[in-house]
Amino acid sequence: MTWSILRYLRENPDILKDSMRKRGLDPSVIDEAKRVDEEWRKLKRQVDEIRHRHNVITRQIASARDPEERRKLIEEARRLLAEREELEKKLKALEEERERILLSLPNIVHDSVPVGFSDEENVPIRFWGRPRVYRGHLDAFKAQTERWGFKVDYELIDWKPVGHADMLEYVLKLGNTMKAAEVAGSRFYYLFDDIVWLDFALLLYAIDRLTQKGYRLVLPPYMIRHKILMGVIDMETFKDAIYKVEDEDLYLIATAEHPLAGLYYNEEIMEDELPIKLVGISPCFRKEAGAGNRDLKGIFRVHQFHKVEQFVYAKPEESWDILEELIRNAEELFQGLGLPYRVVNVVSGELGAPAAKKYDLEVWMPAQGKYREMVSASNTTDWQSYRLNIRLVRKKDMKREYVHTLNSTAIASTRTITAILENFQEPDGTVVIPKVLRKYLEIFPKAPKDAIHPVKKVRG
């Protein structure tokens, strides 16, 4: 049972170097890891040889008749034991050094990932829907579609939709970020009435659809310990994004992916139990320290939100097909909502450390004239399972190996609400509620039924 990164280090380190280059990282660390590993393996052979000699002498002592011979054998056994113990200390230090280096490495980039270092280089692989395009955004729309060789049908409109932030706070008057900033700081919000109902309806819609597909519904812990967090993310990259509970070994979760990945921590899973498909629902908490001044208005990029997350434990030979399943599940949800989108293959330099490959689903935002990310789906292969010690047991020979883990957004409620506010906005400011959500609202007397009406009409 060998972790893939350690296997490639020994069998084909050039693959690891190439993967590092694709991410824009220095590949020389691979040479250092290989040097330490070779030194460890050489010393391991010495230790094993000494152990063997010690065992042989121990048996000779048991059968020795001559006292002098027995004394000499005992002295030699003691010398070998002392030598072995000293070498084992060096061996342990080398093993720890090798582990430190290898655990700092990102996952191996899959061959199908395009090489690039900016999200503007992400490669669209398909489009869906008929977006409404404001005349003033037509050139920008074509640059995001035709540049990549796609001819996407669209509806040209002469009125510019109001942006989601202004729709929320001034047209519908169902949100208040200024007061939330006084109470909690920037990127927090108060939502009211119909928008809250819409938030809940989106969550119910996602878990309803996914549980019908056989995904097990999970309400996970909203906090996790450091050792689990270290197993699921690159802490060096994300330390400024995660909220820590003061004086406690606990962190607020940034996504349900993290506690779901810990569900089988330090466990073995029989082959015939896989794949294990989960759908988690939780609040998410993110510092967004690296966001700077991006998306300061509204609820697109915030410190807390609700999310439904897909998570799968899979056999290695099935994980790539399951990645396609996860993104298709998300696409079906957004098709049901009627939100026009594109799926992009994320370039190597924009992958997070755990991901070997990632798809983003981006919805067209008519007021912004851009496709914006709503969903990320990743195959982390054995990057997380090695750290969390989660193994599968093959039925035929009881061989152990590390499972593959995969994750994908199903619905992030606040972002999806921003897309609804812009895409289903009428000229007067009315927001039509997607039909698939209405059955989750109609049972509540106070919930909106088919539309959210403006307090302040925009036009007409």
Swiss-Prot record:
Binding locations of ATP: R286, K287, E288, V302, E373, M374, V375, S376
Pathways per UniProt: Aminoacyl-tRNA biosynthesis; selenocysteinyl-tRNA(Sec) biosynthesis; L-seryl-tRNA(Sec) from L-serine and tRNA(Sec): step 1/1
Matches recorded under InterPro entries: aa-tRNA-synt_IIb (IPR002314), aa-tRNA-synth_II (IPR006195), aa-tRNA-synth_II/BPL/LPL (IPR045864), Ser-tRNA-ligase_type_1 (IPR002317), Ser-tRNA-synth_1_N (IPR015866), SerRS_1_N_sf (IPR042103), SerRS_core (IPR033729), tRNA-bd_arm (IPR010978)
GO molecular function, one term: ATP binding
Positions of L-serine binding: T255, A256, E257, E309, T409
EC class: ligase
Listed CDD domains: SerRS_core (cd00770)
Catalyzed reactions: tRNA(Ser) + L-serine + ATP = L-seryl-tRNA(Ser) + AMP + diphosphate + H(+); tRNA(Sec) + L-serine + ATP = L-seryl-tRNA(Sec) + AMP + diphosphate + H(+)
Domain remark in the UniProt entry: Consists of two distinct domains, a catalytic core and a N-terminal extension that is involved in tRNA binding.
HAMAP family per UniProt: Ser_tRNA_synth_type1 (MF_00176)
Similarity comment: family membership: Belongs to the class-II aminoacyl-tRNA synthetase family. Type-1 seryl-tRNA synthetase subfamily.
UniProt protein name: Serine--tRNA ligase
Source species of the chain: Hyperthermus butylicus (strain DSM 5456 / JCM 9403 / PLM1-5)
